[in-house]
């Protein structure tokens, strides 16, 4: 596939880009189209047909809305930033070998790697859930605006991520508008999946380094209960992770092998 003009990791960190509700089934369909060996043009046409009656407004939906939805799906699974190609390829391989109910883990990882804004929103959601057991769209919008600026696009993107997480079953609406509680939670025990998810998160932080213990307790990974493993196990399970220590029990991970 051609990758000319793709965003580098540096540029995408300042961008928002996530301006639409993205349903889990749409990501699954997109990944399956890539796994089946379709070229970019065929995938684009297939997504146009697939989304024809699935966006709000049905056949009357504005073309721009569908185009933006497809652009998000393509950036995650079809044409990711060039530094995420290996991550994407490994993610597709893992999808083909793990149970369907665990696919959500891989879709989460690729989404946050392609859209660091998603991870920033998830971090504030996770923090609120830990502190008070609920999370508020308004509170997260205010926190994110402090980081990305007071822009309408920021508030809209936060809202769309909340709606997406609710669609994925990871948040549940309450009787109070804009207030959510935790939804589904997933235990991750497969070392391949853990290593891949750690790598995805390191891409959010421009390759690391990050302390291993901190990664396992990240609020931005709030839907997942990651089985603690050693840095050595992660490095062995990954083609691209590397580790170093600065003291007893202070292991750091970095994307440091051939990428």
Predicted regions and their residues:
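Eukaryotic partner-binding/assembly regions in large regulatory complexes
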Residues: 2-112, 123-124, 135
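Accessory, usually C-terminal, subdomains that scaffold auxiliary metal cofactors
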Residues: 174-254
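Positively charged, polyanion-binding regions of nucleic-acid-associated proteins
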Residues: 26-34, 38, 108-134, 189-210, ...
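Eukaryote-skewed repeat-based solenoidal scaffolds used as protein-protein interaction platforms
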Residues: 122-133, 137-185
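Alpha-helix N-cap/helix-initiation sites
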Residues: 40, 62-67, 84, 118, ...
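Short acidic, hydrophobic short linear motifs in intrinsically disordered regions
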Residues: 42-48, 131-146, 206-219
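Basic amphipathic alpha-helical segments that dock to polyanions
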Residues: 50, 67, 71-76, 158-168, ...
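Short helix-coil junctions and helix-kink-helix linkers
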Residues: 53-61, 142-153, 214-228
């Amino acid at each position: 596939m051609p990758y000319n003009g793709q965003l580098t990791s540096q540029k995408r960190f300042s961008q928002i880009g996530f301006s639409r509700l993205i349903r889990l089934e749409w990501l699954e369909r997109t990944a399956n189209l890539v796994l089946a060996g379709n070229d970019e043009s065929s995938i684009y046409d297939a997504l146009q047909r697939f989304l024809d009656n699935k966006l709000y407004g049905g056949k009357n939906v504005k073309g721009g809305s569908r185009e933006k939805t497809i652009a998000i799906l393509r950036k995650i699974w079809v044409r990711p930033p060039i530094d995420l190609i290996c991550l994407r390829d490994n993610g597709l391989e893992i999808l083909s070998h793990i149970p369907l109910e665990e696919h959500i883990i891989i879709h989460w990882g690729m989404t946050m790697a392609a859209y660091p804004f998603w991870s920033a929103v998830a971090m504030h959601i996770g923090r609120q859930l830990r502190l008070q057991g609920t999370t508020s769209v308004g509170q997260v919008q205010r926190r994110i605006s402090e980081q990305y600026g007071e822009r309408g696009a920021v508030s809209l993107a936060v809202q769309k991520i909340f709606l997406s997480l609710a669609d994925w079953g990871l948040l549940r609406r309450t009787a109070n508008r804009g207030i959510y509680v935790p939804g589904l939670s997933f235990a991750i025990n497969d070392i391949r999946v853990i290593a891949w998810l750690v790598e995805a998160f390191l891409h959010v932080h421009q390759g690391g380094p990050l302390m291993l213990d901190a990664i396992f307790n990240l609020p931005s990974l709030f839907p997942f209960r990651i089985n603690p493993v050693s840095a050595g196990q992660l490095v062995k399970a990954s083609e691209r992770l590397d580790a170093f220590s600065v003291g007893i029990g202070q292991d750091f991970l970095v994307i440091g092998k051939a990428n």
